[in-house]
């Protein structure tokens, strides 16, 4: 159906005392992203014209963390209830738009559920998101007459009879801007909490003869709020379970779905295999037939077809062409690039370095600020000495070079095509094509030499 223009209000002023943290509650992360950012993303995906963020505690930290240009920051200096929070945002409401109210500590609300709520809102009425609970203790109850919603009674204000009601308010609702402003102006704090409840607008709307339509979410987890770290950890597992299920159904082989974490987005080809305790962060692309071993962390990287990443490898902001092999215990830092068939072995670290086709760095090596050609062998213990204490310099190695073990390349330096660097060499000057570079001190031998003995 055709919807009116819509703005979203996100309530995020709470301190989160039960988190026992200096960080505002809504900035605690779920799947690597602040809870409130999940809600902001949902609002933007819905096409919100404006997103009004009502904040209080930790405002400076919130503003540092949230860079969304679409946010309108609304201060709630005193936390006097949800109705009071909405009153702070009301001056920004247009009369002819719908206002959707969300919460920064309810991170798993889905765009699909919110769109259904938006579609269900009657003309001049209210769309209300509700759920039924076996144990509704502590929640506001939905009151009805002849099946029609008439109001919401908070638990502390409810009668014994009303406390038997299982349908509860989630706090998420949508109404017209002009109506919302009028109802907000009529709120009082005449209740057990001495606060201004947004829920009172339901009774006000009913008294005006307006229709209130209740909609249920697809999953209960969508409307679960977070007040402590235990609740946050439970929602984290719910989210991760849902992501793992989607990947499995899409053809990704997760060896143990309960031991996989997705903290971003994963684009994948066919026949991808992911072992246990793997973490995917940011935007990651895995080609066809990629295999990732246990304990790996992959962040903001592209992994080509037929690559194999062995256990306990960290790959960040890197780009791997087809048929590369990495690890175990390797680290590819930002700017690492491997061309087809390249190999990086155990305890090798790369940063701003490029390995050519078929090039191998087998073990115990640091390659930083380097451009390395095709079919190069990098011996164990090789180090590109790229930093002089003030500036970084580049090492260039041509095709078909053999670099012996325990070599230090003091940048800036260039090694020509086909050259050989003898083991134990410190390269301080350019090496020509097909040349042998060696800088070892001549070996001497002292016959009958005795090691020092400790004095007793």
UniProtKB/Swiss-Prot annotation:
Residues 251-456 are annotated as: N-acetyltransferase. One of its GO terms (molecular function) is UDP-N-acetylglucosamine diphosphorylase activity. Mg(2+) binds at residues 105, 227. It holds the Pfam family Hexapep. The active site is at residue 363. The keyword S-adenosyl-L-methionine does not apply. Its EC number is 2.7.7.23, 2.3.1.157. GO terms for cellular component: cytoplasm; membrane. UDP-N-acetyl-alpha-D-glucosamine binds at residues 11-14, 25, 76, 81-82, 103-105, 140, 154, 169, 227, 333, 351, 366, 377. It is an enzyme of class 2 (transferase). It is found in: Cytoplasm. Homotrimer. In the N-terminal section; belongs to the N-acetylglucosamine-1-phosphate uridyltransferase family. PANTHER family: BIFUNCTIONAL PROTEIN GLMU, NUCLEOTIDYL TRANSFERASE. This is Bifunctional protein GlmU. It comes from Shigella flexneri. The gene is glmU.
């Amino acid at each position: 159906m055709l919807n009116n223009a819509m703005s979203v209000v996100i309530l995020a002023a709470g301190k989160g005392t039960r988190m026992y943290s200096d960080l505002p509650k809504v900035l605690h992360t779920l799947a690597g992203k602040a809870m409130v950012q999940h809600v902001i993303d949902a609002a933007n995906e819905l096409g919100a014209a404006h997103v009004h963020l009502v904040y209080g505690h930790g405002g400076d930290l919130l503003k540092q963390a949230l860079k969304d240009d679409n946010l309108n920051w609304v201060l709630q200096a005193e936390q006097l209830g949800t109705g009071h929070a909405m009153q702070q945002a009301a001056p920004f409401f247009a009369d002819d738009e719908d206002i959707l109210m969300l919460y920064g500590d309810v991170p798993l609300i889905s765009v699909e559920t919110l769109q259904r709520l938006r579609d269900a809102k009657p003309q001049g009425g209210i769309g209300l998101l509700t759920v039924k609970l076996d144990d509704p203790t502590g929640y506001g109850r939905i009151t009805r007459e002849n099946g029609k919603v008439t109001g919401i009674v908070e638990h502390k204000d409810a009668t014994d009879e009303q406390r038997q009601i299982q349908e509860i308010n989630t706090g998420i609702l949508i109404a017209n801007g002009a109506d919302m402003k009028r109802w907000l102006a009529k709120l009082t704090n005449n209740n057990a909490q001495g606060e201004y409840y947004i829920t009172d607008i339901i009774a006000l709307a009913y008294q005006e003869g307006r229709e209130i339509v209740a909609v249920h979410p697809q999953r209960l987890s969508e409307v679960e709020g977070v007040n402590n770290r235990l609740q946050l950890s439970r929602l984290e597992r719910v989210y991760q379970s849902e992501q793992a299920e989607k990947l499995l159904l899409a053809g990704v082989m997760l060896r143990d779905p309960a031991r996989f974490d997705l903290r971003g987005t994963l684009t994948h080809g066919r026949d991808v295999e992911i072992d246990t305790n793997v973490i995917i962060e940011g935007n990651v692309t895995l080609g066809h037939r990629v295999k990732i071993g246990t304990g790996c962390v992959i962040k903001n990287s592209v992994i080509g077809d037929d690559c194999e990443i062995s256990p306990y490898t960290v790959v960040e902001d890197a780009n791997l062409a087809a048929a590369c092999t990495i690890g175990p215990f390797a680290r590819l830092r930002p700017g690492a690039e491997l061309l087809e068939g390249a190999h990086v072995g155990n305890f090798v670290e790369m940063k701003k370095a490029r390995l050519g086709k078929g090039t191998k760095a087998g073990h115990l090596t640091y390659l930083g600020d380097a451009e390395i050609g095709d079919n190069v062998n990098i011996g164990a213990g090789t180090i590109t000495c790229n930093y002089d204490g003030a500036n970084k310099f580049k090492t260039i190695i041509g095709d078909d070079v053999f670099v012996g073990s325990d070599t230090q390349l003091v940048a800036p330096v260039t090694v020509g095509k086909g050259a050989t660097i003898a083991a134990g060499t410190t390269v301080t000057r350019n090496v020509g094509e097909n040349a042998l570079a060696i800088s070892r001190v001549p070996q001497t031998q002292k016959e009958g030499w005795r090691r020092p003995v400790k004095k007793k």
